[in-house]
């Protein structure tokens, strides 16, 4: 199992959680970004810089993800592609994307884009909070504990 991170927009507190998890559980974590990323010196953590461009990091993650891998992303279209490949997408607020919910999330995203395109101010997401950080840590911990106990993806 591998943890892939759509790192350009991932909050640093989430990356810090992932760095600790990688070393504690000896799991491979790769941050994929189109900018240079600094990562701690660890044999389990690496950064992969891709060329600048729309969705270059997404394409790299999709090309490399295997069934059962976890992908940390807030990008709904990327999450949909990860699900198609058998990966488990988790957003930085601790919510798992699932085959049951992804179509509705894609529809809502398209609707909000249409509203913004017509000049409607839809606001943005709420500021990232301590509760979001905790929700992420708990969701990741539950999945990793489940895998240790049952040796397989959910």
Swiss-Prot record:
CDD domains: PIN_YqxD-like. It comes from the Bacteria. HAMAP family: UPF0178. Belongs to the UPF0178 family. This is UPF0178 protein in pahZ1 5'region. It comes from Paucimonas lemoignei. The lineage of its organism: Bacteria, Pseudomonadati, Pseudomonadota, Betaproteobacteria, Burkholderiales.
């Amino acid at each position: 199992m591998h943890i892939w991170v759509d790192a350009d927009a991932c909050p640093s507190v989430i990356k810090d959680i992932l760095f600790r998890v990688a070393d504690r559980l000896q799991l491979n974590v790769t941050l994929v970004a189109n900018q240079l990323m600094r990562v701690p010196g660890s044999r389990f953590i690496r950064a992969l810089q891709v060329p600048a461009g729309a969705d270059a990091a997404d394409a790299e993650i999709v090309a490399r993800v295997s069934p059962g891998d976890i992908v940390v992303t807030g990008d709904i279209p990327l999450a949909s592609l990860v699900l198609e490949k058998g990966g488990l997408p988790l957003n930085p607020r601790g919510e798992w994307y699932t085959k049951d919910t992804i179509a509705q999330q894609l529809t809502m995203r398209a609707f909000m884009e249409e509203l913004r395109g017509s000049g409607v101010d839809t606001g943005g997401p709420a500021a990232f909070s301590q509760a979001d950080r905790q929700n992420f840590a708990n969701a990741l911990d539950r999945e990793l504990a489940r895998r240790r106990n049952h040796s397989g993806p959910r």
